[in-house]
Amino acid sequence: MAMTIEVKDELSRLAVKSISARRAEVTSLLRFAGGLHIVGGRVVIEAEVDLENIARRLRKDIFDLYGYNAVVHVLSASGIRKSVRYVLRVANDGEALARQTGLLDMRGRPVRGLPAQVVGGSLIDAEAVWRGAFLAHGSLTEPGRSSALEVSCPGLEAALALVGAARKLGVNAKAREVRGADRVVVRDGEAIGVLLTRMGAQDTRLVWEERRMRREVRATANRLANFDDANLRRSARAAIAAAARAERALEILGDTVPDHLASAGKLRVEYRQASLEELGRLADPPMTKDAVAGRIRRLLSMADRKAKVEGIPDTESAVTPDLLEDA
């Protein structure tokens, strides 16, 4: 929620010079935040937002661009309403504003998505469409496995118009129906960053990107730590299994085992969890890990051949599930 407020606060303070972009933002904000109502036979426009800055911006733009006065009502937090809400209302000139913004078509019928002049506008108009939609009903989650930038939409047509505006900006957005409500969602981290900048929330994007990078670094470090732990566990199990086999090999061969193979086997049995390199340093005289491995391999091979001839359990029989479970 904190990131959402940061984005909306930054966008609500953004200065926009283009008249067409300001008009597109107003149309989008009204479409996604409110609706048209018939009150006493007149068309009334209402838009409900969650920040006072947004309400002030919308009221100013409506007056500057269209010359109509809007009234802002404050709804205090109570009951199911967890926070203060601001409702902007245009009553006396509601129909005129609805026609000029394209919320009503030439025949006075409500437009279900966004008006053609907004959908077919320039790149800065597409940015304004997203800015208005986000100010109305957008959210940005913290960077993570399920991070997303999304907008709740008043209907499928509005959602598809928003997807088209994102495509124009080079961003892949998807329209989804979640619990009966239409939403437009952007999940890719790079795409979220691009869209934040396009809307005008560059400062918030930098904060979001920094948090995303920190999280990725932590995730990578955790994966490497888990990988190292797994490797250590595998190495320990292999060493314990080799020690058990070496001990069985010495039992099978008895006095017939050559001295150099016996010494390597005894080292393996005595230092069960040591690496081959460590065993090599413990040998007298010291030897390489390859030499140690070779001697243990020949010891096991010799013992297994003798066990096969005599029909007795070989060295593999010493490696039991219980032994590895305790490793």
From Swiss-Prot:
Q: What is this protein called?
A: Probable cell division protein WhiA
Protein task: Involved in cell division and chromosome segregation.
Q: What is the lineage of its organism?
A: Bacteria, Bacillati, Actinomycetota, Actinomycetes, Mycobacteriales
Tell me what organism the protein belongs to.
Mycobacterium leprae (strain TN)
Report the NCBIfam families cross-referenced here: DNA_bind_WhiA
* Record flagged with keyword DNA-binding: yes
**What Gene Ontology molecular function terms does this protein carry?**
DNA binding
Q: Which GO terms describe its biological process?
A: cell division; regulation of sporulation
Give the record's family classification. Belongs to the WhiA family.
Instruction: Quote the DNA-binding region ranges, renumbered to this chain.
Output: 275-308
Gene3D superfamilies per the UniProt record, alphabetical: Homing endonucleases
Q: Which UniProt keywords apply?
A: Cell cycle, Cell division, DNA-binding
What's the gene? whiA
Report the InterPro entries cross-referenced here. Homing_endonucl (IPR027434), Sporu_reg_WhiA_N_dom (IPR018478), Sporulation_regulator_WhiA (IPR003802), Sporulation_regulator_WhiA_C (IPR023054), WhiA_LAGLIDADG_dom (IPR039518)
Note whether tRNA-binding occurs among the keywords.
no
